[in-house]
UniProtKB/Swiss-Prot annotation:
Its main location: cytoplasm. This is Elongation factor Ts. Keywords: Cytoplasm, Elongation factor, Protein biosynthesis. GO terms for cellular component: cytoplasm. It is found in: Cytoplasm. It comes from Wolbachia sp. subsp. Brugia malayi (strain TRS). SUPFAM superfamilies: Elongation factor Ts (EF-Ts), dimerisation domain, UBA-like.
Length: 287
């Protein structure tokens, strides 16, 4: 058996030497046929791991001026999350998600993956090669038609980490300066983890529940209706500062809110700026 063929087959499939040698022997040295056989072996090995829990992993970002993607690929241990093959796989998936403008997990799973077939097949092959269950769990896609998309991944190594954020800024101002503003906001989002962009975007049921809890707490103070209302409104304002992005104190300067920072940024970009949307991915979070 030609050793060069065995090495080539291993490089192309990522599987072990013994599997590659056996496949070539069974396929009379035909590399193309052996690849098909090894892919079947890889999928079979992956199926055996389907019930295992993949709770570690990484967040990957792929960013361009007007479009950004965040994906979460899970594995079972931090050891595999730091493996070069895992890093290469998730980086490729983020790139494919961006190139194909994937707005859902299913669309990305069915996208083509060069030399393998589909993204889903590449993930299952990765499960076989790395020996742990791999799972593509979440994807965030954000596009800005009249402005920029900026982003930040915490622990950023080649756009990879455990938490990532994208923000959309609507403006006709200087694009490079908008990117700087957007990255600062994305860093804030990663640190403070807001639940909604504005008060209008906050889940109404959650907001009503919070107000009901506060009203119940204030009842025991035996204050007049007018004073009670002021106390409730004040505590709701504090609540908004905790969960609403535009109401939060800016992490780099707590003397102003994010909404104030947005207004100040308009002078540097020479145009009005609107923070129109954001996305946040935290590894392992269900949100």
């Amino acid at each position: 058996m030609n050793p060069d063929n065995i090495r080539e087959l291993r490089d192309r499939t990522g599987l072990g030497l013994s599997d590659c040698k056996k496949a070539l022997e069974e396929c009379s040295g035909d590399i193309k046929e052996a690849i098909g056989k090894l892919r079947a072996i890889g999928l079979a090995k992956a199926d055996k791991k389907i019930d295992r829990v993949a709770s570690d992993g990484l967040i990957a970002m792929h960013l361009a001026e007007s479009c950004g993607v965040l994906i979460e690929l899970n594995c079972e241990t931090d050891f595999v999350a730091r493996n070069e093959k895992f890093i290469e796989l998730i980086s490729n998936l983020a790139s494919i998600a961006y190139q194909e403008r994937c707005t859902s997990i299913d669309k990305l799973k069915n996208a083509k993956y060069e030399g393998v077939g589909t993204v889903q097949e590449a993930i299952m092959n990765g499960t076989s090669v790395l020996g742990e269950k791999l799972e593509l769990s979440r994807l965030c896609y954000l596009e800005a038609k009249d402005g920029v998309i900026a982003g930040y991944v915490h622990g950023d190594v080649r756009g990879l980490g455990k938490t990532g954020a994208l923000v959309a800024l609507r403006s006709s101002g200087d694009k490079s300066k908008l990117q700087e503003v957007g990255k600062q906001i994305a860093m804030h989002v990663v640190a403070m983890k807001p639940e909604a962009l504005s008060i209008d975007n906050l889940d109404q049921t959650k907001m009503n529940n919070e107000r009901s809890i506060i009203e119940e707490q204030v009842k025991g103070l035996n204050k007049s209706e007018e004073v009670t209302k002021k106390i409730v409104d004040g505590r709701m304002a504090k609540y908004y500062e905790e969960v609403i992005l535009l109401e939060q104190k800016f992490i780099k300067d707590d003397k102003m809110k994010i909404s104030d920072f947005m207004r100040l940024s308009e002078s540097s970009v020479n145009s009005p700026v609107e923070l129109s949307d954001y996305k946040l991915l935290v590894l392992g979070s269900k949100n």
